[in-house]
Amino acid sequence: MTRRDWLGLLSSLGIAAKASAQTAKPAAPTGPKIEPLVLSDTEWKKRLTPAQYGVLREEGTERAGTSPLNGEKRKGTFQCAGCDLPLFASSMKYESGTGWPSFFTSLPGAVQTKRDFHLVLPRTEYHCARCGGHHGHVFEDGPKPTGLRYCNNGVALKFVPEAA
């Protein structure tokens, strides 16, 4: 393989990786059609706290163990803090020991995934299907029945208790 071939191959791989990282696809093909919520950066900053903005709009990560939602055990729904879309039922939550609220699945059609190469090794990142807000990453070390762990930034969620 010549140097030119080698450089061409590396360039192609880089372009393919970037395209893969930017392509969002639904995590589940089922569920109701969700109308997108598109706001300007200024509108998001008015709507969200600085911590929420940092995670939801800038794909940041909150410190492990800091979310009050880690200990949330009531029946209810975990919604996107950016747009109120229900993402997880409380029955989907489990204690992962990671310091972040964790779920073994999401509500149908509620999240979209994409490949994330920020830490060099690819990971699966997930976003709210309505507003595109970053919530966390999906790992393949969760409990049955899915074997998945949706590791969520608590600041990106709000909990709505089930009506009594």
What residue spans do the PLM features occupy?
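Generic structural signal for short, solvent-exposed loop/turn connectors between secondary structure elements
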Residues: M1, P29, E162-A164
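N-terminal secretory signal peptides and thylakoid transit peptides that target proteins
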Residues: M1-G14
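Aromatic-enriched hydrophobic runs in primary sequence
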Residues: A16, P29-G31, E43, Y150
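Boundary at the C-terminal end of the N-terminal hydrophobic targeting segment
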Residues: A19-A21
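Short N-terminal helix-initiation segments at or just after the protein's N-terminus
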Residues: A24-P29, S96-W100
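N-terminal pre-domain segments of enzymes
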Residues: K25-D41
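A short Gly-Trp-Pro
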Residues: P36-L39, K45-Q79, L85-A164
